[in-house]
Amino acid sequence: MRWGCHLPRTSWGSGLGRTPQLPDEHISFLIQWSWPFKGVHPLRPPRAFIRYHGNSADSAPPPGRHGQLFRSISATEAIQRHRRNLTEWFSRLPREERQFGPTFALDTVHVDPVIRESTPDELLRPSTELATGHQQTQAGLPPLALSQLFDPDSCGRRVQTVVLYGTVGTGKSTLVRKMVLDWCYGRLPAFELLIPFSCEDLSSLGSTPASLCQLVTQRYTPLKEVLPLMTAAGSRLLFVLHGLERLNLDFRLAGTGLCSDPEEPGPPAAIIVNLLRKYMLPEASILVTTRPSTISRIPSKYVGRYGEICGFSDTNLQKLYFQLRLNQPDCGYGAGGASVSVTPAQRDNLIQMLSRNLEGHHQIAAACFLPSYCWLVCATLHFLHAPTPAGQTLTSIYTSFLRLNFSGETLDSTHTSNLSLMSYAARTMGKLAYEGVSSRKTYFSEEDVRGCLEAGIKTEEEFQLLQIFRRDALRFFLAPCVEPGHLGTFVFTVPAMQEYLAALYIVLGLRKTALQRVGKEVVEFVGRVGEDVSLVLGIVAKLLPLRILPLLFNLLKVVPRVFGRMVSKSREAVAQAMVLEMFREEDYYNDDVLDQMGASILGVEGPRRHPDEPSEDEVFELFPMFMGGLLSAHNRAVLAQLGCPIKNLDALENAQAIKKKLGKLGRQVLPPSELLDHLFFHYEFQNQRFSAEVLGSLRQLNLAGVRMTPLKCTVVASVLGSGRHPLDEVNLASCQLDPAGLHTLMPVLLRARKLGLQLNNLGPEACRDLRDLLLHDQCQITTLRLSNNPLTAAGVGLLMDGLAGNTSVTHLSLLHTDLGDEGLELLAAQLDRNKQLQELNVAYNGAGDTVALALAKAAREHPSLELLHLYFNELSSEGRQVLRDLGGSGEGGARVVASLTEGTAVSEYWSVILSEVQRNVHSWDPLRVQRHLKLLLRDLEDSRGATLNPWRKAQLLRVEGEVKTLLEQLGGSGH
C-alpha cells in the first residue's frame, strides 16, 4: 500500500516538513541534542532536531552591521516577546498530531523535504501532469538547503525574494512552521526579525484599507516598538508570505498603484504587491509559498529564486521520518482504560518491517514521496498498533488527513464560485474511484483518468479550473504505477484512498443515472411553476366542468413522489451493492480488513508473487467501511468544513437503506474474519442505536483464529459492549489474546453463556480479570474454557476466589494450563467453595498420583460435580488403576476419567480424550503426547487381554487403531 505524511494547519495550511539539502545519492545528517544558541532566547529545554550539513544553524550571518540594529533594551525585549509569542502560536498542534504521544512536538521531530531550484523557463513549459510528475529530481540545478535560499544566484546577484512552490501535500505549511520555530530558537541568525503572514488571513480582510504597520501590529503587538526601525533593517528583515494562492494580486499599475510608505493604508493585496515589487521596504527579504498554478501571479522580474518542494525523493528521508515519528512514546492507555502501551521492541519491529517494505515495494515508496502520505502511514500504523483514543476510527483518520491538507483550500481564489478544492476532487477523483470499485480495478489508463476529469466540461472557464486542479492536486490523489507489468498506468496514491473517495462520491449523492438527472430537472421545474398552475387549474375547474383538469392537477402532485421513489430505489441499490461487497463469499477466507491494511503497509514476509503470475481478484472490503464511517456525525461535520456537506436527511435515508439490507444478509453465519469486518463496519459508523437494531439477532460471536490486537478488542467491545441480549457463545480461541485485551472485552464477556478462551496468552495476571468477571452480578457464563493457557497455580487460586462467589458456571476446562501438583492440590482444598460446578477438566497438567487422588476424592464429595477429567497427567499405572476403581465404584459422586478404559471395557469418554489430542496435536509437546498415548495404548492392550467378550475386544481394537494413527501423525511408532 502507498501512503504519506502531513502536519496540522490551523491557519497555516497543510504539508510537512524540512530537509536541508543533500547530495543526490547520499544523505548526510546528524541527530543531536542542542540548546538554543547562547545568548539567544533560551525559550525551551534542549530538543532533538535534525541537522544536515549546510543548515542555517551553521551558516555565518552576512557581513555588515548584523546584530547592531535592535541593540536598545526596549527593542531587544520586544523582539524577545515576539519570539515567545510566535513559539507559542506555531507550536500548537491539532488533535490529529497529539495522538502521537505527549512528547511529540514539531520542533523535536522534523525532516525537511527536498527543495530543487528551478528556472523561469521551466515554469513556462506546459504542465506534464502525471506522466512525468514523479518524484525524480530533474537533472540540472542542485537541491537547495534552507540556509541557501537567500544565497547569491549563479551570476552573483543578491537574492531578496524566494518563491517556494509545491503541490498539495509536499510540505509547504510545515516547512514554514518549522522555519519560524527555527528563527525563534536562534537557528536562523541571518535574520534579526521575522514577520510571518498567512495570506488566508489577509484575504479575509477583503479590500479594507490597512497599512503595513497596522497589519504587523494587529497581529504582533510587541513589534510596535520596533516599527520605526523596520525601514533600516534591510535584508535582516524577513517577511514570510504563506499560501499566496489565497490572494488575488494585480501587478498592473492601473490595478495597484505604487506605494512606498509602510504607514500608508491600502488594501492588503496592494500592500503585498508593493512589497514584492520592492517599492516598499526594498531591502527586505521575502519568502513566498504557493501552489504551482499561481506562480505566474508574481512577475518573474520580481523573483530572485524559485524553489520546487519535491517531497521525500529519497527513501532514506522517508525512513528517517518514520523512525522519528513512530518512536514517540504513547500515553499507554486505550479507549477502555486498559494499559496497552507499545513497547520499544514492538516499535522497532514496526520500523524495521516498514523499512524493508520501502526497499522492496516501490509503489509505497512512490506514495511516501509526498510527506503528507508519510503522515498517513504513521497515523494508520498508530491506529492499528498503539492505544486507540476513544471514538477514533479509520474513516476519521482519512477525513482528518484531508482536512489537514485541504481545509479552507479553494480551487481558484479569483473565481466567483469560490469552489472548494476538496469538493472538486470528490466529484472528479471520486468518480474515477467509484468506477474502479464497480469494475474491480485499481490500475487506470490515461484515457480513464482524462475521461473522469473532462466529463461534463463545456466552457473555457470550466477548463481553466480543471487545469488548476491538474497542476495543484492531481498528483496528491494519483501516482504513476511503478509495478512490473503495469507501467504506463496510474493508481491511487494509496489503495485505501480509492475506496474512501468512492464511498465519498456515493454519500455525497454525486452518482446519478441519466434518468435521475432528468427527473431532478423535471421536479425542479414543476416545483417552480406548480403552485401557479395549480391555482389556475383550480379556478378554471370551477368555471368549466372539464374532467381532464383534475387529472392534470393530480399529475402535478405525483411527479415529486415518483422522483422521490426513484431516489429511494437508487439508495437501496447502492446499499445492496455495499452489503454484497461486505459479504462476498470469495473473501470469506481472507484476513480481516485490519490485518489486510497492516500487511499493505508493513509488507508480508516471504516470497513475492512473480510478475507473470495471474493477479488475484481485487478486494474492496474497505469501501463499505468507509461508507458507514462517512455517515457518522463527526465525519459529516469535518466534511462540511471541506465544502462537502452531507445533509442530515440524506444521511438518514442512506442509513435506513443500509440497515434494511444488513438486516436481511447480516443474519447469516459468517466466518470469523468476515464477522470482525461486519463489527468493524459498525465501529466506523459510530451509531449505537443503529448497531443495536442490526445486531439484535446475533447470538454467536465466533472470532476463533482472528488475531485480537488492542484495536480489534476495542472494536468488539464498543460495538457489542452496550447490547442487552445474551450471547449463546463467545468463541475467542487461538486469538493471541492477552490480559489487556481480556480487560477491554469485559463488557462483551458479561453477555456470554459459553465462553471459549482456549489457546491464548492468558497468564496468572489475566485471572484477576476472570475473577472479577465471575464475581460480577451480571455474569451469566455457564461454560468456561481456559485450556492451553499458562494460568499456573497462582492463577487458579484467583479463579477459585471467583468460582466461590459465582452461581452460573457449571463446566470449567483447565486442560493444559500448567497447574502442576500445586495447582491441583489447591483445587482439591478449595473445590467445596463452589456448589454449582458439574464438570471439571484438569487433564494434561503434570500432576502426580497423590494430588490427582486427592482431587478425585474431593470431586466425589462435591454436591454437584458429575465429571472430572484427569487423563494425560503424570500418573503411574497403579495410580490410573486406583482412579479407575474410584470412578467405577457405585457410591455415587463424580465420575473420574483418567484413561481410555474402564476396567476391561472402553471408556465412554474415549472419543472426548482422543478429540482433545487431535485438536491440540500441533500445539502440545509431541514427545510428551507420544509418551502419554503409549501408556494409554498399553492400557488398551492390557484390557483387551483381560477380557473374553468379543464385542469389547472389537471396541478395544478400534480405539487402539485410533491411538496408533495419532502416534503415526506425531512421528512415533504405534507398536
UniProtKB/Swiss-Prot annotation:
The keyword Glycoprotein does not apply. Residues 75-556 are annotated as: Required for interaction with MAVS. Its main location: mitochondrion. GO terms for biological process: innate immune response; negative regulation of canonical NF-kappaB signal transduction; negative regulation of inflammatory response; negative regulation of innate immune response; negative regulation of interferon-beta production; negative regulation of interleukin-6 production; negative regulation of macrophage cytokine production; negative regulation of RIG-I signaling pathway. Residues 1-86 form a transit peptide. GO terms for molecular function: ATP binding. Participates in antiviral signaling. Acts as a negative regulator of MAVS-mediated antiviral responses, through the inhibition of the virus-induced RLH (RIG-like helicase)-MAVS interaction. Instead, promotes autophagy by interacting with TUFM and subsequently recruiting the autophagy-related proteins ATG5 and ATG12. Also regulates MAVS-dependent NLRP3 inflammasome activation to attenuate apoptosis. Has no inhibitory function on NF-kappa-B signaling pathway, but enhances NF-kappa-B and JUN N-terminal kinase dependent signaling through the production of reactive oxygen species. This is NLR family member X1. It comes from Mus musculus (Mouse). The lineage of its organism: Eukaryota, Metazoa, Chordata, Craniata, Vertebrata. The gene is Nlrx1.
